[in-house]
Structure formats: structure tokens, C-alpha cells
């Protein structure tokens, strides 16, 4: 009987611009264990600062306004040794990430999953939800181009992501979901009494700790794993079929962990077909470049128009114009923003939806 192949996935909490330290620890782990890391998943606070002008969009106390390491990778002076998939947190160069709101490479080997999305790699379906929850911004559209006036709200999760993701588990199970904010209530599904001893400040929030948006997504998608950062501590919990893992921040021992999962097929990083169909079908709500989504549209209603015939046509057109394989794009982020929107609109128009 053939031995089952295993993929060894590194999962990381908050990076806070310490890329070299993260990759150093991952490399040392490989050397000490003899295990080869398949790819890396990070749960936010990446701080993708290209140059000092980006500091304007980084929402942190003044003493933490530092460039970090990312610019070295952006400039090509350093190269990420592993494919690194990440979502956004609440301490980000939010202007950079808004350009790539549908996802994209920020530099070689570092892929941002966007505001929300689903990608496939090595037979796994991975969902990402960026940002943290603030009730006063959950229905606020994004404005483009990004303005420093929006620095306090760009990283707040909008509730439309619930509808964008809600149907993704209908075709096959989601293997891993990522969020920066914990799903609300998940703290009560683990050893919260022990957690409170180490993090007494969490006790006052109790079951209300975390994002209600992420709670809905977790209960809808029911992924095998849900991985979060933000709270700078390690924590495990069980919610139905989902194993929840929270991690700390780089520089502390609880920042990195590993998942050993079956490798059924080795595949490149690809767009998830269901996600592609959702992206195209909801184009009317995102067609205004200056402000999106248009809340006069119902995301759920737009998605209800999906049919097998339309899905097939969407994937054919996506493969024709973009391709399912996600390829590193070295164009500037504003060009990527314009190019992606151009092709999404083109595909939608060719469907001739009434």
C-alpha cells in the first residue's frame, strides 16, 4: 500500500513587518525537523509598506510607525523563500491592499487574498476574510483611490462579505478559513478559563469577543480549520466540525504552528471556480470605480441568478482572458486594479444577463 503523501503547511499569526524574522524561524524549523514547508499562511498585520509615503495609511500609535522589512522584498533585495498567502489585519498599509481588494501578489511569492476570496492550492480550498469588525463601518462602501482620511476605516470588515462567501461550501467543503478577528463566541468553545488566567482582559467581553461577521461565515461554511490572529495569543477551540486555532505575533514563541494535511494532488495556486462565478455575477454592485459596493444592490439577489450554464460560460471566459492559475504580476498595484476590473466587466457583459 502506498504511503499517504502529506503537505506541511506553516500557519502564522501577526507579522507586524518582521518578514526576515518569520522566514528565519521557518527555515530553522525545516533544518531542525527535516520537514519541507509546502507554503505559508499568515493571518494579518503584514504591514506591506513599500516606501515611507505608505506610512500615512498605517493606523498605529506613532511609536510603532516603522517601515519594517517588506520594502526589501518589494524592491527585490530579499525574496520570500516560500509561497506566502495572507489576509489583511488592522495594522496595514491599507492603500496597498485596497488596490488589490480582489486579491493579488504584493511582491514575488507573497499573495494577498483580498477583502475576501477563495483560492485553491494542492487540493485545498482556502477562504480569507480581511480586517476587523466595527459595527459603524460594516455597511460603509470603499472609496477609490484610497485617501488618508479613510485610514481609520479601510481595514474594517464590511458585512457584504457574508453574502459573497455564503454559497462556497455547497460544491465541496472549505478546508481552511482565515480571519484576523476571531469569530464572535469562539472563545467559549475552548478552555476559556485557562485563557482568562493569561489574558484577564478578555473576560469582560466573554462570548461577545470577536467578529459577528466571522461568526456567521464560520457557521455557514463550517471549514475544517479556522485560523486567526489579532489577539496575540495561542488558543484552540472546537465549533462543530471546525477546529479553531489562534496564534500570536512574530517575535514570540506562539506565533507559528504547522498543519500536516493529506496531499491528494499537487497543484499550483488557482482561483476557486465558485469564487470566480460569485465575482462575475456581483459585478453590477462593484462597477462604480469611485465607490463600491453599491448598497442599492442585493449581493444575494445577484448571486441567485447563477445557473450551471452561466457558471460554465463564466469559467470558459475567465480561462480565456485571465486563466485559473494565479500568476505573479509585477505591474504596479493601480494598473492591476484597473486591469482586473476591466476583465471582470468584460466577462460580465459577454454573459448578456438580463
UniProtKB/Swiss-Prot annotation:
<feature type="binding site">
    <location>
        <position position="59"/>
    </location>
    <ligand>
        <name>RNA</name>
    </ligand>
</feature>
<keyword id="KW-0507">mRNA processing</keyword>
<keyword id="KW-0862">Zinc</keyword>
<feature type="binding site">
    <location>
        <position position="156"/>
    </location>
    <ligand>
        <name>RNA</name>
    </ligand>
</feature>
<dbReference type="GO" id="GO:0008270">
    <property type="term" value="F:zinc ion binding"/>
</dbReference>
<feature type="binding site">
    <location>
        <position position="232"/>
    </location>
    <ligand>
        <name>RNA</name>
    </ligand>
</feature>
<dbReference type="Pfam" id="PF00149">
    <property type="entry name" value="Metallophos"/>
</dbReference>
<feature type="binding site">
    <location>
        <position position="90"/>
    </location>
    <ligand>
        <name>RNA</name>
    </ligand>
</feature>
<dbReference type="GO" id="GO:0030145">
    <property type="term" value="F:manganese ion binding"/>
</dbReference>
<feature type="binding site">
    <location>
        <position position="16"/>
    </location>
    <ligand>
        <name>a divalent metal cation 1</name>
    </ligand>
</feature>
<comment type="similarity">
    <text>Belongs to the lariat debranching enzyme family.</text>
</comment>
<comment type="function">
    <text>Cleaves the 2'-5' phosphodiester linkage at the branch point of excised lariat intron RNA and converts them into linear molecules that can be subsequently degraded, thereby facilitating ribonucleotide turnover.</text>
</comment>
<feature type="binding site">
    <location>
        <position position="45"/>
    </location>
    <ligand>
        <name>a divalent metal cation 2</name>
    </ligand>
</feature>
<feature type="binding site">
    <location>
        <position position="91"/>
    </location>
    <ligand>
        <name>RNA</name>
    </ligand>
</feature>
<dbReference type="GO" id="GO:0000398">
    <property type="term" value="P:mRNA splicing, via spliceosome"/>
</dbReference>
<dbReference type="InterPro" id="IPR004843">
    <property type="entry name" value="Calcineurin-like_PHP_ApaH"/>
</dbReference>
<dbReference type="GO" id="GO:0048471">
    <property type="term" value="C:perinuclear region of cytoplasm"/>
</dbReference>
<dbReference type="GO" id="GO:0005634">
    <property type="term" value="C:nucleus"/>
</dbReference>
<feature type="binding site">
    <location>
        <position position="230"/>
    </location>
    <ligand>
        <name>RNA</name>
    </ligand>
</feature>
<feature type="region of interest" description="Lariat recognition loop">
    <location>
        <begin position="130"/>
        <end position="158"/>
    </location>
</feature>
<keyword id="KW-0378">Hydrolase</keyword>
<feature type="binding site">
    <location>
        <position position="232"/>
    </location>
    <ligand>
        <name>a divalent metal cation 1</name>
    </ligand>
</feature>
<dbReference type="InterPro" id="IPR029052">
    <property type="entry name" value="Metallo-depent_PP-like"/>
</dbReference>
<keyword id="KW-0479">Metal-binding</keyword>
<keyword id="KW-0963">Cytoplasm</keyword>
<dbReference type="GO" id="GO:0000375">
    <property type="term" value="P:RNA splicing, via transesterification reactions"/>
</dbReference>
<feature type="binding site">
    <location>
        <position position="14"/>
    </location>
    <ligand>
        <name>a divalent metal cation 1</name>
    </ligand>
</feature>
<dbReference type="Pfam" id="PF20890">
    <property type="entry name" value="Dbr1_C"/>
</dbReference>
<protein>
    <recommendedName>
        <fullName>Lariat debranching enzyme</fullName>
        <ecNumber>3.1.4.-</ecNumber>
    </recommendedName>
</protein>
<keyword id="KW-0408">Iron</keyword>
<feature type="binding site">
    <location>
        <position position="180"/>
    </location>
    <ligand>
        <name>a divalent metal cation 2</name>
    </ligand>
</feature>
<feature type="binding site">
    <location>
        <position position="230"/>
    </location>
    <ligand>
        <name>a divalent metal cation 2</name>
    </ligand>
</feature>
<dbReference type="GO" id="GO:0008419">
    <property type="term" value="F:RNA lariat debranching enzyme activity"/>
</dbReference>
<keyword id="KW-0694">RNA-binding</keyword>
<feature type="binding site">
    <location>
        <position position="205"/>
    </location>
    <ligand>
        <name>RNA</name>
    </ligand>
</feature>
<dbReference type="GO" id="GO:0005506">
    <property type="term" value="F:iron ion binding"/>
</dbReference>
<feature type="binding site">
    <location>
        <position position="201"/>
    </location>
    <ligand>
        <name>RNA</name>
    </ligand>
</feature>
<dbReference type="InterPro" id="IPR049499">
    <property type="entry name" value="Dbr1_CTD"/>
</dbReference>
<feature type="binding site">
    <location>
        <position position="90"/>
    </location>
    <ligand>
        <name>a divalent metal cation 2</name>
    </ligand>
</feature>
<feature type="binding site">
    <location>
        <position position="134"/>
    </location>
    <ligand>
        <name>RNA</name>
    </ligand>
</feature>
<dbReference type="GO" id="GO:0003723">
    <property type="term" value="F:RNA binding"/>
</dbReference>
<keyword id="KW-0464">Manganese</keyword>
Amino acid at each position: 500500500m502506498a504511503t499517504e503523501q502529506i503537505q506541511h503547511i506553516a500557519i502564522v499569526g501577526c507579522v507586524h513587518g518582521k518578514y526576515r524574522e518569520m522566514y528565519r524561524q521557518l527555515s530553522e524549523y525545516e533544518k531542525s525537523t527535516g520537514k519541507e514547508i509546502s507554503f505559508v499562511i499568515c493571518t494579518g498585520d503584514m504591514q506591506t509598506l513599500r516606501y515611507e509615503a505608505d506610512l500615512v495609511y498605517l493606523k498605529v500609535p506613532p511609536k510603532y510607525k516603522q517601515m519594517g522589512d517588506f520594502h526589501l522584498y518589494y524592491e527585490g533585495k530579499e525574496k520570500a523563500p516560500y509561497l506566502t498567502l495572507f489576509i489583511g489585519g488592522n495594522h496595514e498599509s491599507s492603500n496597498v491592499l485596497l488596490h488589490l481588494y480582489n486579491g493579488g501578489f504584493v511582491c514575488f511569492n507573497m499573495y494577498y487574498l483580498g477583502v475576501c476570496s477563495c483560492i485553491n492550492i494542492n487540493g485545498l480550498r482556502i477562504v480569507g476574510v480581511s480586517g476587523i469588525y466595527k459595527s459603524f463601518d460594516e455597511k460603509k462602501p470603499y472609496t477609490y483611490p484610497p485617501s488618508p482620511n479613510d485610514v481609520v476605516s479601510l481595514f474594517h470588515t464590511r458585512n457584504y462579505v457574508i453574502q459573497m462567501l455564503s454559497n462556497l461550501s455547497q460544491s465541496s467543503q472549505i478546508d481552511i478559513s482565515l480571519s484576523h478577528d476571531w469569530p464572535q463566541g469562539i472563545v467559549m468553545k475552548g478552555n476559556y478559563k485557562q485563557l482568562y488566567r493569561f489574558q484577564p482582559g478578555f473576560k469582560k467581553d466573554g462570548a461577545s469577543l470577536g467578529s459577528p461577521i466571522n461568526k456567521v461565515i464560520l457557521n455557514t461554511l463550517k471549514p475544517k480549520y479556522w485560523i486567526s490572529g489579532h489577539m496575540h495569543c495561542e488558543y484552540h477551540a472546537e465549533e462543530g466540525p471546525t477546529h479553531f486555532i489562534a496564534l500570536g505575533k512574530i517575535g514570540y514563541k506562539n506565533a507559528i504552528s504547522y498543519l500536516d494535511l493529506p496531499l491528494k494532488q499537487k497543484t499550483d495556486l488557482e482561483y476557486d471556480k465558485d469564487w470566480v462565478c460569485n465575482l462575475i455575477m456581483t459585478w453590477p454592485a462593484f462597477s462604480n470605480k469611485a465607490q463600491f459596493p453599491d448598497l442599492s444592490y442585493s449581493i444575494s439577489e445577484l448571486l441567485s441568478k447563477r445557473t450551471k450554464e452561466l457558471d460554465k460560460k463564466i469559467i470558459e471566459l475567465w480561462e480565456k482572458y485571465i486563466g485559473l492559475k494565479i500568476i505573479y504580476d509585477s505591474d504596479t498595484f493601480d494598473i492591476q486594479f484597473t486591469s482586473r476590473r476591466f476583465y471582470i466587466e468584460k466577462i460580465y457583459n459577454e454573459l448578456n444577463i438580463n
